[in-house]
Amino acid sequence: REDLRQIEVVLDWQPLIQEHFQDKDIVRALKIIYCESSGRPNAVGKNTNGTQDVGLWQFNDNTWAWLKEKLKFTGNRSDPILSTKVAKWLIYNDGWYHWNSSKHCWRY
């Protein structure tokens, strides 16, 4: 089944996701990581507008810059711990819609 294959690819990240997400959100978070980066923290997606999406969560250049300014942190999007903490903040403060472009892949 496709859902199981998605989760198997990102099982290495399950402890990190469990540490930062509510139980009800763990599967969704793992599926987003699968859909966005196939669980690869160094994944880079190039966009037609010249920006890049980077890391497990595929944070866009503009979104990452905005979050760094807003939350006053430093660090790299390819850092799986940092990017997961930032994703957690974004999801629990602003919702899942930031990953709507891949929703066809991760929605239940």
Task: Please tell me what each predicted stretch does.
Residues N49-E69:
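Substrate-binding/active-site groove segments that recognize
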Residues D3-Q6, L16-H20, N42, K46-N47, ...:
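Second-shell loop/turn segments in exported
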Residues R5, Y92-Y108:
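Catalytic cores of secreted/periplasmic lytic hydrolases that degrade extracellular macromolecules
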Residues C35-S38, N62-A65, N93:
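Amphipathic alpha-helical interaction surfaces
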Residues S37-V44, D94-W99:
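Secretory-pathway/luminal and periplasmic proteins that interact with or process carbohydrate-rich
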Residues R1-G39:
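Export/targeting segments at the very N-terminus of extracytoplasmic proteins
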Residues W13, I17, D25-A29, N60-T63, ...:
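Stable alpha-helical elements in mature extracytoplasmic
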